[in-house]
From Swiss-Prot:
It catalyses: tRNA(Asp) + L-aspartate + ATP = L-aspartyl-tRNA(Asp) + AMP + diphosphate. It comes from Listeria monocytogenes serovar 1/2a (strain ATCC BAA-679 / EGD-e). GO terms for biological process: aspartyl-tRNA aminoacylation. Keywords: Aminoacyl-tRNA synthetase, ATP-binding, Cytoplasm, Ligase, Nucleotide-binding, Protein biosynthesis. This is Aspartate--tRNA ligase. Residues 200-203 are annotated as: Aspartate. GO terms for cellular component: cytoplasm.
Length: 591
């Protein structure tokens, strides 16, 4: 096999007259009046190859037998295309290769779908034949971008003096967060390793060890219900530092992300990124990861409507809730009564009992609840919401968390439906000043908002075991276009504070020691102040590549039900394997 001289997609007018050797796949073959044209594809693109009997009759005869997706080697000379034959859609469209020789390296069955961009095929089939799906240029380009992003992160962290240190994949199962994937031990029957949800504790121990600056591009595993931007295994850019403030960690993160966007998209992002407290994000956007590319902010109108004779509003306020509204500017004409009823059904998915609405027409409020607003209250509401003719006013009344969840989701939906989002914009945002705990309604207790190793704000440490709801965290999330792409914090580095944290979470001293004794021991040996952040590589690439599903950025992903159609994982194992592990499966009873 002759050595390749060029990739197909690299050929241009500078190569005219040169002899080249190309390897690739047959994208398309056309027989036109004694000439055969083959579009040859490799990872860099497509080039047209011409087989002319006057130039090589033998090559033409072989080319006549090839079919789509055959793997071939072609030797020939680069020529300029005629002016009428130029293909502006191809990067190589001004040249073609006149073939002298062709060698068929391997044949191909007819693929189950065309290997081209924009092909209409189910996700299930794409994943079953993922090796074919990945041949498509748009998929190839995503993984080129992923490589660029990963390389840029590595180069930046290396330049900043970070050490790339691996941590184990077989670790100890610990509570909090998502369910663990468990791995049975053959040597110790009845005992299990866990695949890490993150290297959190181990990277903290590396700070105790004195490494000062650590990073790792690491696989993480979480057995949780899936959605479009989640996978059971994913990759994060994980870093930890000692002796730095959270502002310094944020600055490092911004430097990395600015470099990544420049390398991957050739877009310059301004620093520093905007900052917003958790409370402000929830108040204004109804989300702890707000998309700030568009408006439609939530506005609290409780004071305006508290005296309005509308029982839904009155009841919510009397029960400690609130009334908030979104003013969809100039959108009234876009929504019929049926459309507005559908929005009511939509917000019900987020706990709302309904969606009240008003339209502004000829200076007056119109709609089912307009009758509850006397002239003075109508005027006050219009001022509060800066409402004008043509505006659509949407209201939710309930407990604060339900109002935030329902209107926050509605805001995102309206942003898309009304085409308010500039899809080319990249809007980074820091969300800071998080509560240390959040209340779990099902468990009827407070749980960690991030993880149990997050440092409380110093002034709140005395409240850990007495008034958990008021404790704030030294935590910070980084958001991009409405997606959380990273979370970080300063960490607890003193044993007594960590013990207090565990007690606040409901651990007994005995259970804390059983689960985290090794960490508690380490905190007694001069652990320095430290903190870090973990960035979701898959999600960052997804956003930069303009995709809406993580599956497109992972070479061999799972479906929404955590199944791999390519390998049929997960699958059953043999009785012999189970016996070796001292395991038995529980058979489901069938009626």
């Amino acid at each position: 096999m002759e050595k390749r001289t060029s990739y197909c997609g690299e050929l241009n007018e500078a190569h005219i007259g040169q002899s080249v050797v190309l390897h690739g796949w047959v994208q398309k073959r056309r027989d036109l009046g004694g000439l055969i044209f083959i579009d040859l594809r490799d990872r860099e693109g497509i080039v047209q190859v011409v087989f002319n009997p006057e130039f090589s009759k033998e090559a033409l005869e072989i080319a006549d037998s090839v079919r789509n997706e055959f793997v071939v080697t072609i030797k020939g000379t680069v020529h300029a295309r005629g002016e009428k034959a130029i293909n502006e859609k191809l990067a190589t469209g001004k040249v073609e290769v006149l073939a002298e020789e062709i060698t068929i390296l391997n044949t191909s069955k007819t693929p189950p779908f065309y290997i081209e961009d924009g092909v209409n095929v189910s996700d299930e089939l794409r994943l079953k034949y993922r090796y074919l799906d990945l041949r498509r240029p748009e998929m190839n380009n995503i993984f080129k971008m992923r490589h660029t992003v990963t390389r840029t992160f590595r180069n930046k962290l290396d330049a900043l003096g970070f050490f790339d240190i691996e941590t184990p994949y077989l670790t100890k199962s610990t509570p909090e967060g998502a369910r663990d994937y468990l791995v049975p031990s053959r040597v110790y029957p009845g005992n299990f390793y866990a695949l890490p949800q993150s290297p959190q504790i181990l990277k903290q121990l590396l700070m105790t060890a004195g490494f000062d600056k650590y990073y790792q591009i690491v696989r993480c595993f979480r057995d949780e219900d899936l959605r479009g931007d989640r996978q059971p295994e994913f990759t994060q850019i994980d870093l930890e530092t000692s002796f730095l403030t959270k502002e310094e960690i944020q600055a490092i993160t911004e430097d990395m992300l600015v470099d990544v966007v420049k390398e991957a998209k050739n877009i310059t992002i301004e620093k520093p990124f905007p900052r917003m407290t958790y409370k402000e994000a929830m108040d204004r956007f109804g989300s702890d990861k707000p998309d700030i590319r568009f408006g439609l902010e939530l506005q609290n109108v409780s004071d305006v409507v508290k005296d309005v004779d509308f029982k839904v509003f009155q009841s919510a306020i009397e029960n400690g809730g609130e009334v908030k509204a979104i003013n969809a500017k100039a959108a009234a004409a876009n929504f019929s009564r049926k459309d507005l009823d559908a929005l009511g059904v939509f917000v019900a998915n987020y706990g709302a009992k309904g969606l009240a609405w008003l339209k502004v027409e000829a200076g007056e409020l119109k709609g089912p609840i307009a009758k509850f607003f006397p002239e003075d209250k109508a005027a006050e509401l219009k001022v509060a919401l800066q409402a004008e003719d043509g505006d659509l006013l949407l209201f939710a009344a309930d407990k604060a968390d339900i109002v935030a969840a329902s209107l926050g989701a509605l805001r995102n939906k309206l942003g898309k439906d009304l085409n308010l989002i500039n899809e080319e914009e990249l809007a980074f945002l820091w969300v800071t000043d998080w509560p240390l705990f959040e209340y779990d309604e099902e468990a009827e207790r407070y749980v960690s908002a991030h993880h149990p190793f997050t440092l409380p704000k110093e002034e709140d440490i005395p409240l850990l075991e007495t008034d958990s709801s008021k404790v704030m965290a030294e935590a910070y999330d980084i958001v991009l276009n409405g997606y959380e792409i990273g979370g970080g914090s300063l960490r607890i580095y003193k044993k007594e504070v960590q013990e207090s944290m565990f007690r606040a979470l409901g651990f007994t001293d005995e259970s804390a020691k059983e689960q985290f004794g090794f960490l508690m021991d380490a905190l007694e040996y001069g652990t320095p102040p430290h903190g870090g952040i973990a960035l979701g590589l898959d999600r960052i690439v997804m956003i930069l590549a303009g995709r809406n599903n993580l599956r497109d950025t992972i070479a061999f992903p799972k479906t929404g039900s955590a199944v791999d159609p390519l390998t049929n994982a997960p699958g059953e194992v043999s009785e012999a394997q189970l016996a070796e592990l001292k395991l038995e499966t529980v058979k489901k009873e069938t009626n």
